[in-house]
């Protein structure tokens, strides 16, 4: 589903991206066409009053008009191609939608008709005065007529052969009676499939409506949750166990309700099948009586009725079984309700429970489809039975007329006999499917009973067993030991009877042997032993083993605590010895060795503690072997994953310990160096240097101890202020990154604008040097890219101003948050002074106030720089706007962009207008032969183009 949601989100993004590109392309094209049209209208509106204007119009304006026409044709061709492509894609999309949502196909068709009618009206209005082009004549009329006659020949031959009496074998290879029988059979199958299709469609619609109701309810509840969370500012998360339990309960309840509903439908179907079976039996009796009355022959229907009696008995038995299963389902429903009301949690782990529930859901779904198919089959049986009864009643009314014509009566009776056989086969099919459905119902009810009954309490989760093992009380331990002794005596008596008595071992081995012997006795099913008592004793021994293991674990935890306490005492003694022996430099050199010994002792104790934890986390292999290791691979996989997870945790803790020890060693080395320097200075001093050194060391020790106590006794107020300041510092990093990138863009904008202005100044100098009016249009192709680049830079500058405004607002909000922190610091200091507990001292408040003041100063500096950047960008934007207006006025950029197409005016295919006729008008003159007509055509063409 995530993947589907992700793919839907990506497709939406891609569609919006394409739509944006298409809209930009269309907007650009429309803008270009508008500029070209305005320019061409200016050209056409000019008057050629003088000879110079007419010459300019001929040599300069005429090629521009021709290029405009060519570019307009190209643009129209591109639009037509795009329209063709988009219409094809739209048609494919409509086809896909129609295949996925067939109910909405008429709506699409109506929309298409409306659109086509609109386009048809527009086309008729626009092309009202345009004459219709006649169609091309058929070149090969004889061949077309011959092909048409060949196509019509098979129809004529079929008409002629249809009147003949001979039976013609068609391409299917069947005769007419066989074909009629095949058609009848296929029509009946189609009818059955259509009936099943209607039932499936109705169930699908009902399920779809329920699905949307559930979706609506979920949406309303989610909106209610969001509203409550926003109102109170708190959120509640459901635990995994609670969510799993709720989902399991809902799934089991839904399956149980669906099974009851299907059971009722199946019972109703059984009743209907029994009624139809009785009708078939009555119809057979009527046909038999008619045959014996009019034909005196019962051989047609004289068959053993054992099958019908057996089927009737089976149907009655199935109905009784269905009623019994319905009662069982009601009892199971009551068990489920009591189980869920009592709040009993499922003891199966999540994977096993999910697999069992999935299996039950799949069975219920298959049962639902099978019941719908069975209902459709019974509906078909009812229709055909009613048809047969109608025919029998018609035959009974006309039996007086058919009494004389016995052959016709016999044929009709045979036809009804065939229909009766088909009905009996259909009835037998219904019975077989009913028995098969009953088997599936039994299986589903058994699974539901297992999920709601005893299997829910067979396996216990590991966390629950651990918690129970840790929270054992001493009285329960004593009771468990007494119970273990009683069970051991019973098992010894049983061993004496079977001749398998063994020697006693230590406490744990005796318990293991006792449990194993009890399991062997249960498997071998010895007559002298009751299996129930053996099972009870086994469960008791298992619980005692768990309690004994828990007591061992608690003892090991206490041992680890004592070892850690001894290690800490040893560490304190080492540090005291180091501080006492600081008077001599030679003794100071021995401190690293003591520290290394301390570290090795701590690491050794830590390793012992980790080993003990690993032993505690191991599963109870004795209990698993006693229970037979049914899911051996699953247990091994879980054990492997736990070992791997423990290894990763151990590696992580080891790395953390290494880094911690490295830092501690570095600090201790620094302290040792400092002490050596002090020793050297004190040895050079006066004779009372030893006293001074001891005083300084005591002061240092006091300061170090005070700082350590201060770090250890950090109050909640300090932690809260520290968290707030750290959050602001992290936000500072993100803000500085965005601020630096934005300021880096300013330099690039400066350089690009300067370069563009330099290029524009060069072009202006070239235009001034040429001095002619044609130079402006010649330089337009060079100015156009610069104009486009400046427009892009102008857009980017606007975006930068928006980003700068957002950064400015963020700075204001940060300044307000810093002021709020200052107010909170002063309030906390006043409250601590009033309470006289001094958990938050003035020294701590001054420290935090200093940090906040530094952050406020940095914030003000950044705000000043940002304001300067905004002013600079605004100035650049004004300069760019001014330059763009200047380019539009000087170079008349409203014309066409591509002047490279002017070379097309020299093509041979273009008709040319002579200058004399264009200026002075055309005169009727007799054409004279050219002097160059005697030349070679290629040379004549070159000469013509050169002139």
UniProtKB/Swiss-Prot annotation:
Polar residues compositional bias, start-end: 525-536
Family statement: Belongs to the NET family.
Transmembrane segments: none
Keyword Hydrolase annotated: no
Basic and acidic residues compositional bias, start-end: 474-514, 537-555, 580-589, 610-620
Any one GO molecular-function label of the UniProt entry: actin binding
Organism the protein comes from: Arabidopsis thaliana
Region annotated Disordered, chain positions: 455-555, 580-620
PROSITE patterns per UniProt: NAB
Protein name as it appears in the record: Protein NETWORKED 2D
Function: Plant-specific actin binding protein. May be part of a membrane-cytoskeletal adapter complex.
Sequence ranges assigned to domain NAB in this UniProt record: 10-90
Record GO cellular component, one term: membrane
Chain coiled-coil ranges: 176-205, 247-342, 375-433, 645-684, 744-773
Record InterPro entries: NAB, NET2A-D/KIP1-like_C, NET2A-D/KIP1-like_dom
Keywords, in A-Z order: Coiled coil
